[in-house]
């Protein structure tokens, strides 16, 4: 279910009741399994209202296209004082479908290990950035 016709994500619902204690996390069942369109994977993301109003966050979740099991969501209660109660039918997260590209990993003669795009360009040729990272290109 999408919240509106322009919503990027599909709402995921809890099938059971859970109590998420302060600072703890739980794995929540959704009761669904999905078949993804070719060339896509599923990304499980938080719902902004749960995060802002209740301090409930979704930990990273990736659904690979060949996964056939139940979609489950890892929720963490960031509120250190109050438990959060989840009831059946609560919208707990959203599923966003994203396209992906499989790149060939190629080892180079230097310490850099790069990726080759579908065009055959290496990431090193495209970036020419070197080994600097984490803020090396500025703000």
What positions do the PLM features span?
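DUTPase catalytic domain/fold
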Residues: 1-139
């Amino acid at each position: 279910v999408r919240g509106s016709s322009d919503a990027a994500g599909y709402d995921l619902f809890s099938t059971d009741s859970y109590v998420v204690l302060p600072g703890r996390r739980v794995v929540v069942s959704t009761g669904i399994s999905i078949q993804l369109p070719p060339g896509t994977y599923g990304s499980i993301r938080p719902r902004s209202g749960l995060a802002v109003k209740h301090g409930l966050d979704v930990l990273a979740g990736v659904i690979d296209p060949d996964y056939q099991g139940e979609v489950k969501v890892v929720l963490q209660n960031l509120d250190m004082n109050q438990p959060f109660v989840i009831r059946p039918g609560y919208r707990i997260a959203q599923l966003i479908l994203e396209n992906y590209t499989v790149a060939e990993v190629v080892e180079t003669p230097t310490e850099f290990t790069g990726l080759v795009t579908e065009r055959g360009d290496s990431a090193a040729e495209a970036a020419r950035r070197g080994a600097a990272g984490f803020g090396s290109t500025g703000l």
